[in-house]
Amino acid sequence: MGIFSIANQHIRFAVKLATAIVLALFVGFHFQLETPRWAVLTAAIVAAGPAFAAGGEPYSGAIRYRGFLRIIGTFIGCIAGLVIIIAMIRAPLLMILVCCIWAGFCTWISSLVRIENSYAWGLAGYTALIIVITIQPEPLLTPQFAVERCSEIVIGIVCAIMADLLFSPRSIKQEVDRELESLLVAQYQLMQLCIKHGDGEVVDKAWGDLVRRTTALQGMRSNLNMESSRWARANRRLKAINTLSLTLITQSCETYLIQNTRPELITDTFREFFDTPVETAQDVHKQLKRLRRVIAWTGERETPVTIYSWVAAATRYQLLKRGVISNTKINATEEEILQGEPEVKVESAERHHAMVNFWRTTLSCILGTLFWLWTGWTSGSGAMVMIAVVTSLAMRLPNPRMVAIDFIYGTLAALPLGLLYFLVIIPNTQQSMLLLCISLAVLGFFLGIEVQKRRLGSMGALASTINIIVLDNPMTFHFSQFLDSALGQIVGCVLAFTVILLVRDKSRDRTGRVLLNQFVSAAVSAMTTNVARRKENHLPALYQQLFLLMNKFPGDLPKFRLALTMIIAHQRLRDAPIPVNEDLSAFHRQMRRTADHVISARSDDKRRRYFGQLLEELEIYQEKLRIWQAPPQVTEPVHRLAGMLHKYQHALTDS
């Protein structure tokens, strides 16, 4: 496909984006808004943002959800801006500095919350800054400006949603159904690989791909949930399927690891059975029926616990999969599965990374303030706004540097494009609403195509062009003002990029160590006799951490294997029949405290000391298990865990 080619699948969204822009423009001028530009800009960003993220037309519900987050972020930012202005109106410089800190604080929060919800906090940060900067000439108009800004943004969001509904957004349901079938086949093929006990790298690639696909399916579930309330039953089933899919991965990998030391546990009966190739979900269904008969014939005692657990999870997966595809009423058997264990939320391992983002945003905003005050440039305020926008939105993404470059390219492209609209098109179309709408629809259409291709600078060009062309009421054409605005955007993006380069983010290794120690803590916390604690479902949270580890350290197989081993240890110890007595219970609490100290230790020396203490406590614990005559189902996984921690203690303690 050529650089300027237009694919058929890109046309519908391009028309949708053009419609959203035209609707916002028409409504803005019809209701005599002072700056319809904000409504048009909001409609464009809300519609184009999900398309840029998806690399194509977004699924149904994505635009509505993004609009909802934008409304929340705008209202939080407006309220924060009003509070700051009321409290510090007599000290303008302090007021702006507090706003810079507020923007940094919002970026810090957005780095810790779920990525899909972080948009609202990033927006809240720079909205307050926009209000404080804009009202500098006339502070008494602050409430009016805040109300107008909220109104214009709500109008833009409504227009984007109307355009989305008008062009019948595509549903993600069929993709979910296909992925459920394909994922089950892949799970069976992983178990075949693990029972064959072949090349470790092939197995690593297979389970790594399944972790990514299961995480992607969870993302699809979120999209389906946003799409319509009629998928509520499917959403409940998919949430349980996520845990079942992770359970299947865990049991398969444990089957592989067991054969490293005790290959005789997997009998020839099961090896021959899993030799049969499968291609479709129907093949898997037939094999599972046969496998259940084999287990009934051999007996539970003669079946390896990992295979028995795998078959049980695969059977439940199949049952819920049929319910998702048909979206029928949840029956009693399904309800029993869905009333599973409560999921545990873990503390973010990226706190240091979030603090780096706080300083990047705060320092870049303060730098913009100093630049504005030192130069006295009329568009210094515009540069400050762009600094806040770039840093607030870039920090929450995996590669902030590339986001800043995208904004720089976009603002550079917006200069000639905006010049064409400012000098030629808008002056010749302002007398006709129809011609004005057509001219902006053409802009939205072609940039909408480029946004779907994820062309570098396309998203920034769309927002920056709309921001600098004259869409005020009434329209005034001052070339110096246009040039100042365009140059202010470019300077702001360059300053933000400079701060991102100067304030290095060296938190990657620390985050990796914290993640690995959290896996250790989870494995240790599984050693408990507390019934409520044993029923807690840690699996989704553990695999979420594993997915983060895979993204932070792509290709680092030793780290992935260590993390997976800790997850397997957690699952095995969680189900182990640990003797119930006060002596062991007290020691469980002591080991959990020590594991927490390992995670929270701020220096390598303290971390090594606490980790050494944890290893000593594990030795004492194994002795206590022998005294209390614990069965092999308890002593063996504890011994394996202690051995793993001894082997990898340097990787788990050194920065």
UniProtKB/Swiss-Prot annotation:
<feature type="transmembrane region" description="Helical">
    <location>
        <begin position="152"/>
        <end position="172"/>
    </location>
</feature>
<keyword id="KW-1003">Cell membrane</keyword>
<comment type="similarity">
    <text>Belongs to the aromatic acid exporter ArAE (TC 2.A.85) family.</text>
</comment>
<keyword id="KW-0813">Transport</keyword>
<feature type="transmembrane region" description="Helical">
    <location>
        <begin position="38"/>
        <end position="58"/>
    </location>
</feature>
<feature type="topological domain" description="Periplasmic">
    <location>
        <begin position="480"/>
        <end position="481"/>
    </location>
</feature>
<dbReference type="InterPro" id="IPR023706">
    <property type="entry name" value="PHBA_efflux_pump_AaeB"/>
</dbReference>
<feature type="transmembrane region" description="Helical">
    <location>
        <begin position="69"/>
        <end position="89"/>
    </location>
</feature>
<dbReference type="GO" id="GO:0046942">
    <property type="term" value="P:carboxylic acid transport"/>
</dbReference>
<feature type="topological domain" description="Cytoplasmic">
    <location>
        <begin position="142"/>
        <end position="151"/>
    </location>
</feature>
<dbReference type="GO" id="GO:0022857">
    <property type="term" value="F:transmembrane transporter activity"/>
</dbReference>
<comment type="function">
    <text>Forms an efflux pump with AaeA. Could function as a metabolic relief valve, allowing to eliminate certain compounds when they accumulate to high levels in the cell.</text>
</comment>
<feature type="transmembrane region" description="Helical">
    <location>
        <begin position="431"/>
        <end position="451"/>
    </location>
</feature>
<feature type="transmembrane region" description="Helical">
    <location>
        <begin position="482"/>
        <end position="502"/>
    </location>
</feature>
<feature type="topological domain" description="Periplasmic">
    <location>
        <begin position="59"/>
        <end position="68"/>
    </location>
</feature>
<feature type="transmembrane region" description="Helical">
    <location>
        <begin position="407"/>
        <end position="427"/>
    </location>
</feature>
<feature type="topological domain" description="Periplasmic">
    <location>
        <begin position="428"/>
        <end position="430"/>
    </location>
</feature>
<feature type="transmembrane region" description="Helical">
    <location>
        <begin position="370"/>
        <end position="390"/>
    </location>
</feature>
<feature type="topological domain" description="Cytoplasmic">
    <location>
        <begin position="452"/>
        <end position="458"/>
    </location>
</feature>
<keyword id="KW-0997">Cell inner membrane</keyword>
<feature type="topological domain" description="Cytoplasmic">
    <location>
        <begin position="391"/>
        <end position="406"/>
    </location>
</feature>
<feature type="topological domain" description="Cytoplasmic">
    <location>
        <begin position="90"/>
        <end position="92"/>
    </location>
</feature>
<keyword id="KW-0472">Membrane</keyword>
<feature type="topological domain" description="Periplasmic">
    <location>
        <begin position="173"/>
        <end position="369"/>
    </location>
</feature>
<feature type="topological domain" description="Periplasmic">
    <location>
        <begin position="1"/>
        <end position="12"/>
    </location>
</feature>
<protein>
    <recommendedName>
        <fullName>p-hydroxybenzoic acid efflux pump subunit AaeB</fullName>
    </recommendedName>
</protein>
<keyword id="KW-1133">Transmembrane helix</keyword>
<feature type="topological domain" description="Cytoplasmic">
    <location>
        <begin position="503"/>
        <end position="655"/>
    </location>
</feature>
<keyword id="KW-0812">Transmembrane</keyword>
<feature type="topological domain" description="Periplasmic">
    <location>
        <begin position="114"/>
        <end position="120"/>
    </location>
</feature>
<feature type="transmembrane region" description="Helical">
    <location>
        <begin position="13"/>
        <end position="33"/>
    </location>
</feature>
<feature type="transmembrane region" description="Helical">
    <location>
        <begin position="459"/>
        <end position="479"/>
    </location>
</feature>
<feature type="transmembrane region" description="Helical">
    <location>
        <begin position="121"/>
        <end position="141"/>
    </location>
</feature>
<dbReference type="InterPro" id="IPR006726">
    <property type="entry name" value="PHBA_efflux_AaeB/fusaric-R"/>
</dbReference>
<feature type="transmembrane region" description="Helical">
    <location>
        <begin position="93"/>
        <end position="113"/>
    </location>
</feature>
<feature type="topological domain" description="Cytoplasmic">
    <location>
        <begin position="34"/>
        <end position="37"/>
    </location>
</feature>
<dbReference type="GO" id="GO:0005886">
    <property type="term" value="C:plasma membrane"/>
</dbReference>
<dbReference type="Pfam" id="PF04632">
    <property type="entry name" value="FUSC"/>
</dbReference>
